Amino acid sequence: MTPRFAVYIAAHDKPALFADLVASLHHPQIDVYAHVDRAVDSRPFHEAVRAVLPEAVHPVRFVAERDRIRVNWGGISLVSASLRLLALSTGSGRVYHRHSLLSGTDLLLRPLPQLIDAWSGDVEFLRVDCALDSGPHRATVDRYHFPDHPSLRRLSGRIPRPPIERRLYRGSNWWSLTDAAIGIIARTLADDPGWLRDLRFASCPDEIVFHSILMGSARAPAIGQNYAECVHDNYRHPESDCVHSDVTIHGQHYIDWTDPDGVSPPDLDVEALRRALDGPALFARKVPSGWTWRTGPLPDGDTRDGDTTGRDTTGSDRPTRVRA
């Protein structure tokens, strides 16, 4: 049986980049589902997809307007949006071998046959950095945080809370998980709603919920980047003694977290793209406005199989839009 793959895109801006990502993933074995942040108008995202794939039938299945969520960075709202996407794919009746969460400003790095081959395996593309049982990251769960409540944000991290009696782990939000792993997560959350209640006022629960459930499951040995037992003070620090001191690989993504004080990864540029292409990542984030995709020579004329940038040859630094 030919495997199928579900892609979930969380989008909140840059409809043209979102549409280019959708177009780059257009394949008979891939179904794309999208959640557009309720804070923005979803119509430009629909229109952008129709513009790049005018002949395609349902190239994207969007979360319905009534089900969209206003997403706030660091809040449980991103977990809720991910669960809406999972519910939408479950409702389709289709069975998927793998489920992947992407951002609307992600860049596909590999040719589709290579992507399909990687997705057909059984590894859980997930990065788990640390257990939240001690150290500075414990403050993410032992104090109240209010990213989804603007009027209370000034109190975030100031109010202690009762201990959460669960073994908790933290890692990168972006994941690509087998259907077995997604099934474990879905059943766990259905059987124990306390998971989401306990982490509702954590900081960045999107980096905790799925990771913690899988680390306590039979799928834990299949997690591709499990660094929870490493001894380190700061999981982003490039001088860590841990083998995970490469802070650019996060599950299936290249994300440059080499700045230990950074609060957001920098936009992708040509040099970062070269590093991403030379590594194992399948996707990179995040691409800036004006970047379009995803095939053709590198800017200096260096052509290589699988190169996914599109740039003109007129001397302009602006990427050129290439349609396939």
Model region roles, listed by residue range:
Residues M1-G306, G315-A324:
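ER/Golgi luminal nucleotide-sugar-dependent glycosyltransferases, focusing on the catalytic module
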